[in-house]
Swiss-Prot record:
Transport of potassium into the cell. Likely operates as a K(+):H(+) symporter. It comes from the Bacteria. The chain crosses the membrane at residues 23-43, 57-77, 111-131, 148-168, 179-199, 217-237, 258-278, 287-307, 348-368, 377-397, 409-429, 431-451. The lineage of its organism: Bacteria, Pseudomonadati, Pseudomonadota, Betaproteobacteria, Burkholderiales. This is Probable potassium transport system protein Kup. Pfam families: K_trans, K_trans_C. The keyword Transmembrane helix applies.
Amino acid sequence: MTHTAAGAPRDAKTAIHAPSSRMALMLGALGVVYGDIGTSPLYTLRACLNTIDDLQPAHVLGVLSILFWLLMIVVSLKYVTLVLRADNRGEGGTLALLELAVRGREGRARWLLIVLGIFGAALFYGDSMITPAISVLSALEGISIVSHTLEPWVVPVALVVLVALFAIQSHGTGAVGKLFGPIMALWFATLAVLGGYQIWLTPEVLAALNPVWALRFIAEFPVMSFLLLGAVVLALTGAEALYADMGHFGRPAIRRAWFAMVLPALTLCYFGQGALLLRDPAAIRNPFFLMAPEWGLAALVGLATVATVVASQAVISGAFSVTRQAVQLGFWPRMQILHTSAVEKGQIYLPQVNALLLCAVLVLVLLFRNSENLAAAYGFAVTGTMLTTSVLAFAVLPRDSTGGKRVLWMVLLGALLVIDILLFGANIFKIHEGGWLPLLVGVVVFTLMMTWRRGRRLLADMQARDRQPLREFMTQLEAFPPARVQGTAIFMTMNAGNVPPALLHNLKHNKVLHDHVLFLSIRVADVPYVSEDERFEMHKISASSWQASINYGFKEDPDVPDALRQVAEAYPEIDLEPMRTSFYLSRQTVVAARRPAMARWRRALFAFMARNSTRSTRFFKIPPNRVVEMGMQVEL
């Protein structure tokens, strides 16, 4: 007998974020989605042109043209127009796209996509470390334009701002978050006004809108053009957030915000800086802040600092979200996940991730000291993630197309993939300048994620090899039962349909069986949310035992007591009164096998991660005073 929980399907995305109007959604997208790419003008053009010794108008116009057309091709075409189509039930991001890419695939192709997707997600952590450091530093560097005597204060003030930013994470950003949209709207308006005024003074800069300037620059300086791509890509930082945050605001709001406000403001700002450099090449020391009048510099530094805090908040929240997805999909050990809002379910806080990010960001600020030094490190993380997205999109978007439409998809995505390869290749040459940092972070996180996934898979395979069919076992056990005790025993199991080790240990040591036995398995679907009518499935195993499977999406937090309340309503014959219910869990200790399935260092790493993962009781919200843990050793 199978049962599915009753209830109307729930639109999870609407439940999480349902603003009352299109304008509210667009304003929210400005504050969350576009903070990173919106603060790129602080450092991008300076990083592009600072290495050219004798800056000429042709250099300025050529680089501006390349920058503008990359914005149009990579952001407007690739992300806003195409990649946003690859949604996993309304959700985006590397791991959501990975789940779509591997769906229905087996063998080597599936394994390669998983490896690529995990490495792309791992590189995102490098981005999450660099973005707060480079953004806040670049904003505060404006105080050296206000007064040279203030320059030594840039790093100390940046450290204070960053510590404060990470300190407030545990309290949530609900109240302050309502200001993010208006703050970024003011920021983009400021970019447009500053840039527009400079263009009005030097309208010749608009010639760079013609792609001929980009092609001419590439033809005349091919090597320089390729290497400059490593800096021009800084204008694209944050493009990945458009896709990752699709679940919060929806495709239409993100597209409207980009074309109506963000793209025009960025274009005006970059071309405004170019206009200033055409008149005064010496302004390359900080073209963004030198666009402003002296009387407005202090206010601009303050606004820029607040805008970079908003941008940093977006990537910190993104790191929390990616980690939760990785935990739910089995790529990361269980971690403590706290909700900071009773209304917004998407507002979460992971203490361990927050602490590690803070330490990493502070080290980066002290190590690199200024935004220019961090620029090389930034580009590698960004282009690596973008390349991953392109490959996964190549595996997803043409899938349901046939004939000429499929060929068109392949050609278009192939061309975009070539551009991403060029951008990534240009940043490989910057590994020695700082690109080693996100590469190192990516390799470390990738190794951790693959080790955890491999270890869990080996444990599951080991249990499957030693499996005993649950239905037959319970039928035989009830035919010759041990002593029965009152109440209900709930056995958590990884493999539904097989006898859980905790039951065998309980029978061996305690020699009793409860009046009611419920075998409970938690399943995470390859979709972000599961509707309430699909929350659980029930099968009757024997006269006094049942098998329950509770289903969650990869963006949901398991809540076993809440799910059991639904089971109790549907199955009143099972005694699930909390005070008469005991949970039996297995606690495994990894030891070396005679023929190890993992290298010694990987086995030690997996065992360390397992010991330090959040306990099952806390992760599944099970009352600890109702839990019996059965310790056992497993060989790897």
